[in-house]
Structures are given as C-alpha cells and as structure tokens.
Amino acid sequence: MKQLFKYALLFMSTIVMGQNVIEVHYRHVDSDKIAEFEYKENEYWSKVKQAAINDGNLLATAFFRVADAGIVDDPTMPTHAFVLVFKDFEQLSNSKSIWANAGKVLGFDPSTVGTDEISKTLMVQRYKLIDELPLQEFKYAVWNYSKPKDLNGFVEENIKLWKPHFKKNLGKNGFAGWGIFARVYPQGMNESSVLTYDHYTTLASAMNALSPMDYDQTIVSKSKMSEYDPNGFRYRVLLELIEFQGSVN
C-alpha cells in the first residue's frame, strides 16, 4: 500500500474559538487488518468526507493512527481516531448527512468498501473548543486527558500561563501547535472533563515532550496545577497523522 501520510497546514480560522465542536471516534483494528482499514478509509471514505466539507456539512476532519497500533494488539484499546470538526452544535446534530450521499459520491454501493466489519468503534466523545494557537504543519499529536479538581483554574492557567509559553516556542524543537477542549458528552465521575493537545513535526520531538523532566522550570515555578489538577493527566496518547482534510473561507 502506498504511503498516504500527509502534512497538514491548519489555520486558526479552521476552528473559530469558542464556537466549534469536535467529535472524536476511537476505533480498534486488529493488526492484520490495519493496512486494509487504512487503505479503504483513505481511498474511499476520505472522498465522502471531502464531499461533506464541500457541501458545508463539515469543517474539517483528521485521521490518526495511535503510536502502538499493530504492535500491542489489545482489543480494548484504540488503534485509530477520527476527528470531525463542526461549526457548531447544529451542524453536529446533522452529521448523518455526511454519510447520506456516500453511494452518490463513490458511484457504487458503499457497503462493498465498508470498514465496520474490520474495525470496532470503542467510544465517541464530543468536545467544545476553548482556545488554541494558530496551527502549523504537524505529523504527530499528543492528547492529554484530565479531570481537574478546579476546572476554571485549570483552564485559566492554560490560557494565561501555558498558551503564551507555547506561542513563544512555536516552530522550535518540532513544536507545532496547542489547544484545549472542554468535554461536552459523555460526562461522568470516571470521564475526563478536559483535553489539551500538542502538535509536533517529528516523532522525536513528540517523545521528548512526553519525557517527565522535559519542562521549563521557569514556567513550572509559576504554575498552580498541583492545586487545580493534583492527580495530573489521567491519560496521554501519542498519535500519528495519516490525513487531514478541510478548507477555510
């Protein structure tokens, strides 16, 4: 299978602060089916999503592979993630329209290239954008899930302390973007309430960022995260970008 990995240049106007809604679909694919799954998604279903973008039913979409996909074959863990970006909740509520014209877009019965039989949807999460930096080209993403004790304090520090720090470091050491989302649904005692993301141009830069000691101590000394989120990130995941689609007006 030919390599379909692409760099994506994302602009701030792709996601309007405080407005856009993000839906994340997590899939598990057995290791012996990953090549087939990725081929079908890129060759066929990317056309369906592009048509939805062209028709105004979707702003943007990204297709990711989890770093250990195909290496650790745990059926309870995601191997891939689809990110769908909607203008607002109204557009999200009409998301079924994305797939309604699949047959017309493809020109044949879409069930013949379906991926449901070779993958399992483990969960779907919806978020609302709080803030982010203008994004640059990236190849890897780190998603940080948290359930802070003080959500308002957590968000305020991210915007007032960490965002300026990250902005200053855009383009340095492979760093390419940052953002923060609030969980909309599902919600619960065992669910993260917020997600932050970091983007990187290389695997090495992403791995360096995951290192426990790789923090600017001048920033850490000003942080009150030990109060806002005493337990730290509940989970962190490293993903590789396969494809990004979307245009901005």
Protein language model annotation of sequence segments:
Residues 18-103, 112-249:
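Short S/T/G/P-rich N-terminal loop/turn motif that feeds into the first structured element of a domain
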Residues 1-21:
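Bacterial Sec-dependent N-terminal signal peptides
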